[in-house]
């Protein structure tokens, strides 16, 4: 195989920190700039209106942008292994929730789980379309500023850089909250594991899936 000599012809200034800075669009995406849009099934009946839903988005302090997984199929051939594409796999999606004093979100997830299978007798809704719902995680960008004019952000809304719509979610686990006399300077939080059928990704324009 011939050596590509073009790799030796890259100017030194293309390897500089300034060159790297110019390619780091918007200063890079930040893992602490995100929000989760909630959509509980109507049968759960937890939120009174969209304003309350929007308010409680702030209580979700941890989430993930989903992985893209394709299983491999190994086909043996004369002592070698041919690896071909298998089936898609979608990992469970875990979020971390801050537990505020009214237990609103914990109640919502406990009701959702109870809506699927009741803790008392094992009955529940049998139609998946009634307990599936679509959740969304938004990667946010940093708001643009114009210090010369206002000294403040040019807009109150952080831009959405990427949006992932998690399809057919339902909670398979709502974690325990540990209690202890020794714990100080801490607010309760808990994790929820949501099973996902598939996901779709959208760019900032939100005009169609980018995948």
Where do the PLM segments sit?
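Glycine-rich, low-complexity intrinsically disordered segments
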Residues: 1-211
């Amino acid at each position: 195989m011939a050596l590509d000599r073009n790799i030796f012809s890259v100017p030194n200034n293309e390897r500089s920190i300034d060159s790297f800075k110019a390619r780091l669009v918007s200063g890079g995406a930040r893992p602490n700039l995100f929000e989760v849009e909630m959509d509980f099934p109507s049968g759960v009946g937890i939120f009174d209106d969209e304003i309350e839903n929007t308010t409680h988005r702030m209580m979700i302090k941890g989430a993930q942008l989903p992985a893209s997984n394709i299983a491999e199929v190994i086909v043996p051939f004369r002592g070698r292994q041919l690896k071909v594409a298998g089936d898609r796999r979608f990992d469970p999606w875990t979020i971390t929730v801050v537990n505020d004093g009214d237990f609103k979100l914990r109640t919502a997830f406990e009701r959702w789980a109870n809506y699927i299978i009741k803790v008392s007798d094992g009955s529940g809704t049998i139609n998946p379309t009634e307990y599936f719902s679509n959740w969304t995680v938004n990667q946010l960008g940093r708001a643009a500023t114009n210090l010369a004019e206002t000294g403040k952000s040019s807009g109150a809304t952080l831009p959405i850089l990427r949006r992932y719509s998690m399809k057919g979610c339902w909670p398979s686990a709502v974690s325990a909250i540990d209690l202890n006399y020794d714990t100080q300077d801490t607010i309760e939080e808990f994790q929820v594991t949501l099973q996902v059928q598939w996901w779709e990704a959208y760019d900032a324009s939100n005009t169609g899936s980018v995948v």
